[in-house]
Amino acid sequence: MRQIELIELEPIQSDVVYTPDDVAKSIVDWLQPSGICLDPCFGDGAFYKHLPNGSDWCEIKKGKNFFSYEKKVDWIIGNPPYSIFEEWLRHSFEIADEVAYIIPTNKVFQRQVIMKMINEYGGIKGIIIYGSGSTVGFPFGFSVGTFHFSKGHKGPTSLKLGNT
């Protein structure tokens, strides 16, 4: 495993986007995770409270930095910081077999390096497209989706139009 230099990052205000509880619940219900699950960006606990018992969490504001988390898990589910999405996704792929994030859709498709990383990991097993972020209670209007990345997945990608 590669070494990650831990640095103190000042929170970027645009990275603090809390997921409404009903949206988090609908995502967890769609995925039906089992085994060891991790919410890597706890925030207000919207995802964590819907994960199976025994799940773990990280939250930099509470002293649990996701980049220092090295235990293997079956699932990672959450709403990651957008400004460091590439690094966040890379670390997620190193420790989990199934990863699902609600994120602006351009974060997945805008850079070839991210698409290559996804392809090397496996693939996108499913996507829920919500349309504008404001439809799920986010403070912005660009397109948002939940992406389910699966290690070793080379099959089709299911697409769902979501409205929670």
Identify what each model region corresponds to.
Residues 1-164:
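Class I S-adenosyl-L-methionine-dependent methyltransferase catalytic core
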